[in-house]
């Protein structure tokens, strides 16, 4: 497969650094399978769906997983080192995989202090620049420490242009987020849903269901040849309960469409769908990799933001709609100056 067909040039000024205010005022590009493109707003969403259609949200919660700490000087001839840490994945009660900068100034056994009573020891260094951190707290105490001292882990294309702040605590967390905080990135299509929009969704007779997928940093990593040769992506934990699976199958059998809100919800549905399109309850990791030519079994439409060029997510939307149509839609979005990525505008894909 030629990965160059999934590349496109995006002007940097179209990368949104803050969400629209209010968030349901973002623009919405409606993409029909016959090639029609309609410029709308997110609040128009109910107009393009049918009574009984089911919006499927990812209810994961984002951890304030970005930390600033200090590695004390090792001797009188050296200095303390300021360290930026981004937690990636929980590995045990106190153990977390993380990315740390400056990695070259760190070694096994180093202690990093984030606040009084909150620290971690480097248990080991891993390939790809990751480190394994052994924290001095776990469970609810760890979550409380992150809430007190961590910042929201903004995507790299935002973080390199501005630091996270208190506003991101509100705007980078969906209203569906459950209590299980384990994601290091938000399911960003869900950020557009305000109480006002949710009321309009309900008034239009649309249904809502939730699934859960904990989003990892792999969502921002570039595709590599091994992903194609192995037909696998990074693993992410996901869950669909038996009750939700039954309701989704019943809705579809009655003629309703399943409309995942975001690629993480779509990956969850597709990873739990059989060849007949029936959705099965499941809990555990998935490394599903959807690309053009792969069957899409459980997704009838998709609401999603605009994705990075050359990314697995742009390949996913191309699997649903076709590569040529998605390239045309993105070209239109760029020409019309839609805002891209996590805090940007959205599109509604109707095959």
Swiss-Prot record:
Function: Transfers and isomerizes the ribose moiety from AdoMet to the 7-aminomethyl group of 7-deazaguanine (preQ1-tRNA) to give epoxyqueuosine (oQ-tRNA).
A GO-annotated cellular component: cytoplasm
Descriptive protein name: S-adenosylmethionine:tRNA ribosyltransferase-isomerase
Assembly and oligomerization: Monomer.
PANTHER family linked: S-ADENOSYLMETHIONINE:TRNA RIBOSYLTRANSFERASE-ISOMERASE
Predominant cellular place of this UniProt entry's protein: cytoplasm
GO terms for MF: S-adenosylmethionine:tRNA ribosyltransferase-isomerase activity
Subcellular localization(s) per the UniProt record: Cytoplasm
Enzyme Commission no: 2.4.99.17
Superkingdom as given in the UniProt entry: Bacteria
Keywords: Cytoplasm, Queuosine biosynthesis, S-adenosyl-L-methionine, Transferase
Reaction(s) this enzyme catalyzes, per UniProt: 7-aminomethyl-7-carbaguanosine(34) in tRNA + S-adenosyl-L-methionine = epoxyqueuosine(34) in tRNA + adenine + L-methionine + 2 H(+)
Pfam families (UniProt xref): Queuosine_synth
Pathway(s) it belongs to: tRNA modification; tRNA-queuosine biosynthesis
GO biological process terms, semicolon-separated: queuosine biosynthetic process; tRNA wobble guanine modification
Homology family: Belongs to the QueA family.
